[in-house]
Amino acid sequence: MEKNLTTGSVLKSILYFSLPYLLSYFLQTLYGMADLFIIGQFEDISSITAVSIGSQVMHMITVMIVGLAMGATVNIGQAIGAGNKKKAAKDIGNTVTLFMMLAIAGAAGLLFFIRPIVGMISTPQEAVSETVIYLTICFLGIPFITAYNIISSIFRGIGDSKSPMYFIAAACAINIILDYLFIGGLHMGAAGAALGTTCSQTISVMIALVVIMKKKTGISLSKNDFKIERKTINRLLKIGIPVALQDGFIQIAFIIITIIANRRGLDTAAAVGIVEKIISFLFLVPSSMLSTVSALGAQNIGAGKRERAQRILYYAVIITVGFGVMISIIIQFIAEPVVGLFTENAKVILLGSQYIRGYIFDCIFAGVHFSFSGYFCACGHSELSFIHNIIAILLVRIPGVYITAKVFSSLFPMGLATVGGSLLSVMICVIAYVWMKKKQGCMD
């Protein structure tokens, strides 16, 4: 059943919704980390690099799917908050139709251009063949990745963040088992990592479909709801496209950083790839707050409770800043052991510890602008989220990483360059928020 999150304690509502979301993100992150950890125990550095680079490409695709699905979460949430279940049903049906069409077309296109993609990201020659195999298998699984994220966005839109957690928990457990089978037992290398991930995601979707058929959501769907309606699609895309583009550009920035790292050699490429995995794990709290603020904010805005939506934003900022400060201090003392979990190569550990000691401060500032981005999406102004991220990427993040990589032998300054981009984003978000309040924001 849908959960009404427009009444009661704001903090309790955030915790009720965000904790399952946080656990979902944690489990989903274990996908990539498990692949990298397990392949590091059985294969050489070229296989590690192939999985690291390939998983970054897949992460970019996945976050763009999730970003586009944000339009569904917000629209469904606003409909639920307003008590309009007919509109919610239409939003759900059109979301399913649109996304499955995009998934099939997208998978076909990516498979066709797989070689240029691998070449474009400057994959080290030693890792090219395994990267191609890894991505081929993963691209074939895109319809299932899309299906999972559609289902999750629908559940979160109606206020249920627990069901997606159960789906991903099952998939994660299966993925780890299959990784040990395919990589450790059958010695399939990067192909085994990709196959384990794709198979487990497929099983997750099957479990989700069974749950949907049995679960009482309070929303009745008809065949007519699945017919494309331009007004409904436009509302979904108005919010979803800016978020998807934003997430895509962020991942492109990370891929450019990977290219810069790749050109410094295999050791640097492996170090940066490992740290990106660790950071993706530590970013669980900021990421969960973005989604929590957008979903809870949408319900409250739909119910006409704008001040409550603003309080949700304030609490989210406090939570993320507190977490960011704490984890930034801790990492300064344990950087080497953390990086060492993924490799025994002393040079990679040294470079990785340098990079993460600078990069980790991004947890503080990213948490703030993630929370603001969630609020902007809930208000229907996702273009603001897109704008601040693009400005930060083009003016600070990419130029900063390029310059520091050229000037310094240590990777610490390269990590700080990323932090500078987030700091600029925070400044822009605060200005935009003040402007929205003056203009009585959250208005279409």
For each predicted feature, which ranges?
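Short runs within selected transmembrane alpha-helices of multi-pass transporters and secretion channels
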Residues: 138-156, 164-172, 193-206, 287-290, ...
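Helix-terminus/linker motif at the lipid-water interface of multi-pass membrane proteins
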Residues: 30-49, 118-125, 181-188, 248-275, ...
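Alpha-helical transmembrane segments and their lipid-water interface positions
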Residues: 28, 32-39, 62-69, 73, ...
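Transmembrane helical elements of multi-pass membrane transporters/channels
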Residues: 16-35, 137, 171, 200-204, ...
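Small-residue-rich hydrophobic transmembrane alpha-helices
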Residues: 48-108, 145-164, 258, 271-335, ...
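Small-residue hotspots at the loop-to-helix junctions and early N-terminal turns
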Residues: 43-56, 135, 194, 266-281, ...
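Short alpha-helical transmembrane segments in multi-pass integral membrane proteins
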Residues: 1-18, 76-141, 185-241, 297-362, ...
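Residue-level signal for short hydrophobic patches within transmembrane helices
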Residues: 7, 11-30, 34, 57-64, ...
